[in-house]
Each structure stands twice: as structure tokens, then as C-alpha cells.
Amino acid sequence: MIFDKDDFKAYDADLWNAIAKEEERQQNNIELIASENVVSKAVMAAQGSILTNKYAEGYPGRRYYGGTDVVDVVETLAIERAKEIFGAKFANVQPHSGSQANCAAYMSLIEPGDTVMGMDLASGGHLTHGAPVSFSGQTYNFVSYSVDPETELLDFDAILKQAQEVKPKLIVAGASAYSQIIDFSKFREIADAVGAKLMVDMAHIAGLVAAGLHPSPVPYAHITTTTTHKTLRGPRGGLILTNDEELAKKINSAIFPGIQGGPLEHVVAAKAVSFKEVLDPAFKEYAANVIKNSKAMADVFLQDPDFRIISGGTENHLFLVDVTKVVENGKVAQNLLDEVNITLNKNSIPYETLSPFKTSGIRIGAAAITARGFGEEESRKVAELIIKTLKNSENEAVLEEVRSAVKELTDAFPLYED
């Protein structure tokens, strides 16, 4: 049978050669994309398990198909661990992605056409926080709030004033490119003052929240969403949390049958594994090291007058750098660094003047290199290599030196131990 090949790599050589090349790329590249991480072998094993064969529409104890006793155990493990991690009363582990988690949260809290306040994309928000190209901006009347133009920090007085003017039904807090601590209690105060609900998307900082290194939004938000990858170091997927039983029912209905059919139980299993890893004391050490490494890299840029750190520094796993004094734009910087095996992404900065396809900045994250074992010394070295590359973009001899230095670092810290 074609479905029972023992030597599956030989059977589909084109595919497996591509996967092998990606494994080689990840091993030999320094990964600084803030939304990426390195999962454990246990997470990959669960995601590649026989659970992928099972369809299980519904929820534990309330399925539409038979033969779901085992997947009920798996999903319940994931649910209970998520609740324990974040101190939430209810958790839905079925969202296929963070965007779908956000979609379900909106469906549970507001109606199409309602006014919503979300963070401006250039200030650090996410596409699903009201960008016109996103379902969120097309379904709801989003009004964006921005950071202060001088400090590049959230200005809660300005946000309150704006909320009083636009009278939103919902305020969305959370970001994909904001390097400072977010005070969720102040967002809740603003929401209460104008009669709005509060939703928090903590996708980027969930691992730091889980480790107690960033204030948790769960006590303040009516609904909290997150991805399960990024700083949580789990599989790609979504998670929704709430302490409100009625909202939990709405969330469950919004996910299934609202926007999804059967859950991906093999991914739910991988989430369960990663949640167990998060509950291990070693995860707190990992999360603390992520912040240390992020700060170590940022400090190198702060000492160079040719670069500017947005908001003046970082208190989490990422930061933005304005590179326009050194190279034309963020896209040029991203491409140059790709050539020396350092991977990051171009990123808009507050009050951006360039298109999102070029940008003035780059975004640098420490989650993946920390997972590999990089410490503060190696992180500083990485920042120095970035600066060296961008300032010597036409000097092939210097670029080759950078490639060699990158290879030394990646060889010293393998992606996975054999």
C-alpha cells in the first residue's frame, strides 16, 4: 500500500529533502524573529502522534462522534494545565491560531459594526486589532490608539480621553511589537469608565506572564487570548481564557460550531505537553533568561548613536530598532542579515513614514536563541554582529567574518542535542 511505506523519506524525497534543508537552516541560523521559538522534542512527538487520525467535534464529554474517550483525556489535560498556569477559571484550547482565538473573542463580546479601540499597528498592535486588511477591521468599527509620540509609551490619559470620545463597546490591549510592561489594570479602569469590555491579546508575552515576570491580564480582562507558541514554547495554535462562566459558554460556541469544525487533537496534545513544561520550575529560569538576553542585545544598540531603540529599551523578550541612519530601511536590513544567517523581520515603528513593506525599523526577539542556550555574552555578540553587518554591507570580507562568527555560535549551541 502507498499509505504504509516504511521508508517514507525515500518515497517522497522532494518533500523530505526540503524538510532536511529547513532543519539545516534552523541549525545554522541565529533566529531573532520575536514570534518564533524552538519547541521540545516532546512537543513535536505529540504533534506527530496518532491523534492526528481522530475527529472530535465538540468538547470533552459532549462530542458529536464516538470513540472520543481518549481524546477527551488529552484535551482535559490541556485545559486544566492552561487554567493552572494562568489562574483562569475557564480555558478553550481548541483555536487553531491566535487570530482565530481573537475572532472568537470578538464574537463573544460584541456585534458586527460595534466600535472597538485597538492599538495602532505601527505603535505595536497586531493585524487582528483592527487593521483594515484584517477581518477585524472589516467586521467592526475599529478606532486605533497610539503611543505617545515623544516617549513612545502607552499614554493612559490620552487613551481614556479617546475612549470617552468614541465610546467603544470593547477595548483591546496587547501588542506584537511593544517592548515595555503593559499595565492591564489601567486598561480595565478605562474600560469600566466608559462602559466597555476589555479583551487582552497576550500572545507575545504569555510565557513571561506564565513565569510571573510580566503582570497577568487574566484578573482584569473579560477575555484573554494568546497563541501557544512564541514565548510559551508550544506548538502553533491559540488559547482563550476567562473567569466568566457565561462568556466561557459564548467562547465555546464561537469556536465550535462558530468558526471551526473538529479540533486538531494532535496539536491539543502538543499544547498539553508544552503546558506541562511551563509548569516546570525550569521554565521560569528560561523566561528570566529571555528578558536578560533581550536587555543585553538592546544595551549594545543603546551604546551606538547610529541606532535608536524604540521607547528607549526593553522590559520583555523583544525590542525595535530604527535603522534608517545606517541603511535605507528595515527591509534592506532584513535582507542583509539574511545573507549572514541572522534572521529577523522588518517592522514599522511608531508614526512610521515608510510603507509596511519597507519600514524604518527591525524587530529583534530573544526567545529562540535563549531556548538554544544563548546567554547574555552570546546575546551581546549577536547584537554586535548585526551592527557590524549593517555598517559594512558592501564589504564582503567583513560579511564573511560575520558568517564565521554566526557558525561558531550555532555550532556551540545546537538546535537539538542528538
Swiss-Prot record:
Keywords on record: Amino-acid biosynthesis, Cytoplasm, One-carbon metabolism, Pyridoxal phosphate, Transferase
Modification type N6-(pyridoxal phosphate)lysine: residues: 230
Record's catalysed reaction(s): (6R)-5,10-methylene-5,6,7,8-tetrahydrofolate + glycine + H2O = (6S)-5,6,7,8-tetrahydrofolate + L-serine
Compartments in which it is found: Cytoplasm
Binding site for (6S)-5,6,7,8-tetrahydrofolate: 121, 125-127, 246, 355-357
Domain of life the protein comes from: Bacteria
Entries under Gene3D superfamilies matching the protein: Aspartate Aminotransferase, domain 1, Type I PLP-dependent aspartate aminotransferase-like (Major domain)
GO CC entries: cytosol
One GO biological process term: glycine biosynthetic process from serine
Enzyme Commission number(s) of this protein: 2.1.2.1
GO molecular function (one): pyridoxal phosphate binding
SUPFAM superfamilies noted in UniProt: PLP-dependent transferases
Matching Pfam families: SHMT
Site positions per UniProt: Plays an important role in substrate specificity: 229
Top-rank EC class of the record's enzyme: transferase
Pathway the protein acts in: One-carbon metabolism; tetrahydrofolate interconversion; Amino-acid biosynthesis; glycine biosynthesis; glycine from L-serine: step 1/1
Subunit structure: Homodimer.
Task of the protein: Catalyzes the reversible interconversion of serine and glycine with tetrahydrofolate (THF) serving as the one-carbon carrier. This reaction serves as the major source of one-carbon groups required for the biosynthesis of purines, thymidylate, methionine, and other important biomolecules. Also exhibits THF-independent aldolase activity toward beta-hydroxyamino acids, producing glycine and aldehydes, via a retro-aldol mechanism.
Similarity section: Belongs to the SHMT family.
Name this protein carries in UniProt: Serine hydroxymethyltransferase
Source organism per UniProt: Streptococcus pneumoniae (strain Taiwan19F-14)
